[in-house]
Amino acid sequence: MVRATGSVASRRRRKRILKQAKGFWGDRKGHIRQSRSSVMRAMAFNYMHRKDRKGDFRSLWIARLNVASRIHSLSYSRLINGLKCANISLNRKMLSEIAIHNPEGFAEIANQAKKALEATV
């Protein structure tokens, strides 16, 4: 009886791993056993860092808003509180973009937040 090796599927599977290991250094790019473990590790880091990226961007937006709001004599937390009191529902990404690309518009938003804070006190 003919021996079934599954060679086509095996070759395809190995080639896929080696293709993903392109750019790795040393044996990691050419030997299937090292490549497989390196690719799995890289994929795990990739997954983790895709999740981390969301928080990284949020931190960046908050830092930008803190700088922009302090120009208008508000802290970041008082700016956000004032916006909530004024019923202005802009997210941090949008506020950050406004602060960078349209400082006059951000000044108006900050003034509305200040007025709302003064009204609540």
Swiss-Prot record:
Q: Which Gene3D superfamilies match?
A: 6.10.160.10, Ribosomal protein L20 (1.10.1900.20)
Keyword Ribosomal protein in record: yes
Keywords (A to Z) from UniProt: Ribonucleoprotein, Ribosomal protein, RNA-binding, rRNA-binding
GO cellular component: a single term: ribosome
Give the molecular function GO annotations: rRNA binding; structural constituent of ribosome
Kindly name one Pfam family recorded for this protein.
Answer: Ribosomal_L20
A GO biological process of this protein is:
ribosomal large subunit assembly
Entry's PROSITE patterns? RIBOSOMAL_L20 (PS00937)
Task: Specify the signal sequence span.
Answer: none
Q: Does the keyword Thylakoid apply?
A: no
Which protein family is named in the record?
Belongs to the bacterial ribosomal protein bL20 family.
What is the recorded function of this protein according to its Swiss-Prot or TrEMBL entry?
Answer: Binds directly to 23S ribosomal RNA and is necessary for the in vitro assembly process of the 50S ribosomal subunit. It is not involved in the protein synthesizing functions of that subunit.
Task: Write down the HAMAP family for this protein, in alphabetical order.
Answer: Ribosomal_bL20
Q: What is this protein called?
A: Large ribosomal subunit protein bL20
| Origin species | Chlamydia pneumoniae (Chlamydophila pneumoniae)
Taxonomic classification, please?
Bacteria, Pseudomonadati, Chlamydiota, Chlamydiia, Chlamydiales
